[in-house]
């Protein structure tokens, strides 16, 4: 009678996730000498896994004299749930070689899940090969897991091949394929598959929305979310709200973001920590740091992401002192910072010239928190040194850091050379960039050309352009979005087909004429790398996407309200000058989020102090 009693009690612990009670029952079972009973041991492994105590599950498993497939699958699942998927593979390997057990369908599912979590396609293919020759080769649950694994690893053709081989497809396999297409930016295929999905539930809607957000297709994500609301799908899980808040953040769609925030409150999810974290990030990216701070202050429970999201938001908007003060508050509350926290902190120091504080924080990462600096941390420190005129120290950092420097690292130093007037050093670094990298960032091309042009090295300018042509560089078309009265309008560079093109042209022309008279503005055509006459270059500058977006905002937005722009590329130097002048002439605040930072244009000045 003892064993059935304890089995029942342990099953209740698993259902209710009561770890303390499970440990007490375990102690009684050990004391009674029945811990080696296989059903009890299997249940203990399962209970500890369900309660998030993977180390206890593994200990019970290791002490079992006789292991079966149930215990094997349970411990592998427990390790996966604890984000210890690497350990999952090693435990599988050791048990398989020592006990002679062959994996069953549950073990295969756990292994495939581990490979998906790790993004380890090599291990995943090995598991797939073992599965194909096993007696479970037609198991459709394992096949669905394989679809998910291949999709998460970006191998959509392999995922589709497995998907097509499933006779009776379940929600997992359908959703995995839809999510895979969406995450890869294959919009049409994702939507086509989603439309024919037999049963759409919240999980499948969330997968499509989340996939679009992750691939940078915020407008598509919001469109799907709107359709989901029209279909009256019950939102019983806050994950979909977190995804759509992320879409609003990426689009800097503050009006839509506030509407989603209202929905979060109405549905009672405002106490969820990860939802609040997403809202902090959203408001910061919509340039409303006050609202982000308000969300933070109202949170009853905060984790490291909560603190870090607000620190990064403050840093990106030039509020370095506030970001550093918040970090001190975070530490005093006993919250341990993570890697992202330090990226935000060093970035904050970089934009106000706090060299010693930046160095101190960089050293504190390892000394106080055991965090190994990444290439991103080194690049932030290099940017800090470069902005402060310490170019020799910055270059020495590149040569001594434990990572091979990449294009953004060298480009950060090259930008500092241009700003600090270190022409010879800039030319040397530019030569190194051209000879050592297949350049990918459009802003690097412009920087190279300007460095060579400033030294009147026209042959090098031509050579750089020729090499860029040989590399077949395909830069994303420049585009800018502006949110006006609940609608997001997108403009592309050179676009002259907008319904309001005549109004936009007249306003931009009027503003340009006033800039020329009032501010002595002369278009800086060095930002146009095409081989054409000056008049054509000026025309290209005139139709840069951020200018059209600002003009549209001035025409359509509520008078006196800030105009918020999101651009996918770095703002060019000429547009930066133009936006400063427009902010002064129109007495409007213009906030631009480009590929590198936030710019607050107000009264003829920019928060970046002309260095971005």
Swiss-Prot record:
PROSITE patterns named among the record's database cross-references: PPR (PS51375)
Predominant location category: mitochondrion
Residue span of region Type DYW motif: 518-612
Region (Type E(+) motif): 486-516
Name of one Pfam family that matches: E_motif
InterPro entries: DYW_dom (IPR032867), E_motif (IPR046848), Pentatricopeptide_rpt (IPR002885), PPR_At4g14850-like_plant (IPR046960), TPR-like_helical_dom_sf (IPR011990)
Type E motif: annotated span: 409-485
Chain positions of PPR repeats: 37-71, 72-103, 104-138, 139-169, 170-204, 205-235, 237-271, 272-302, 303-337, 338-373, 374-408
Listed GO biological process terms: cytidine to uridine editing; mRNA processing
Assigned protein family: Belongs to the PPR family. PCMP-H subfamily.
Record-linked NCBIfam families: PPR
Name under which the protein is recorded: Pentatricopeptide repeat-containing protein At4g14050, mitochondrial
Organism field: Arabidopsis thaliana
Encoding gene, per UniProt annotation: PCMP-H13
